[in-house]
Amino acid sequence: MKIRLLKPLLIVGVLLMIWQMVATLGSFPHYIFPSPQAVRQQLFTHAELLWQHTQVTLLEICLGLLLGFLFGLISALLLSFSRQISAVLLPILVISQAIPVFAIAPLLVLWFGYGMASKIVMSVLIIYFPVTAACYDGLRNTPQAWLDLAKTFNISPLRLLLKVRLPAALPAFASGLRIAVSVAPIGAVVGEWVGSSEGLGYLMIHANARMQVDLMFAALLILVSISLCLYFSIDWLLHRFIWSV
């Protein structure tokens, strides 16, 4: 356990050393590439401001993650339950991916406003298709021996889905959840970049416009920390409390 904790701390320490060396030896102006000390000072000086924007972004990420995974899981269940539904819904899902989600970010702000709703929708759209694909793939690849055994009991398609396909697809669901956790922050922050008045993405744009690059780095550092904490927390929960995948 101690070794597992030591490795990430060692990696962080090495990255901080490289950052400090580049900032010191690279002769970059402080307003182009701030040192770790300057960023740390901003973290303490603007702690209240950073916490205020962090709460907004964290809520957007969590709601987008929850809704995106839920919609993706429901869609995968519908696709696997009925061939008729799959024949109609699957082409629509594939065609929808031809439209870059980032390209419609301004439209989402126009439709849903500058508040939290447009950022949550952005996160949901980014999460939805990868989660649907991962969960659907898991539901389709049920071991044939399980299916053959289920047929001997003449169970209904619904019971086959719930009792056989669903348990067999649990590792795929875990993979889908990990994907969702990885990409959820992207949607929230891109939405804040396009149009917002709060959140870490907004704070980064605001600080960049005023050449407060050290504050922008502080916001970025918090965002990276949130992403890593969410991912490793979900990964630990999946291994510790649910199943080992």
Curated annotation (Swiss-Prot):
SUPFAM superfamilies: MetI-like. It is a multi-pass membrane protein. The keyword Cell membrane applies. Residues 50-234 form the ABC transmembrane type-1 domain. It is found in: Cell inner membrane. Pfam families: BPD_transp_1 (PF00528). GO terms for biological process: transmembrane transport. Keywords: Cell inner membrane, Cell membrane, Membrane, Transmembrane, Transmembrane helix, Transport. Its main location: membrane. CDD domains: TM_PBP2. InterPro entries: MetI-like, MetI-like_sf. The keyword Cell inner membrane applies. PANTHER family: ABC TRANSPORTER PERMEASE PROTEIN HI_0355-RELATED (PTHR30151:SF20), ALKANE SULFONATE ABC TRANSPORTER-RELATED, MEMBRANE SUBUNIT (PTHR30151). Belongs to the binding-protein-dependent transport system permease family. CysTW subfamily. This is Probable ABC transporter permease protein HI_0355. It comes from Haemophilus influenzae (strain ATCC 51907 / DSM 11121 / KW20 / Rd).
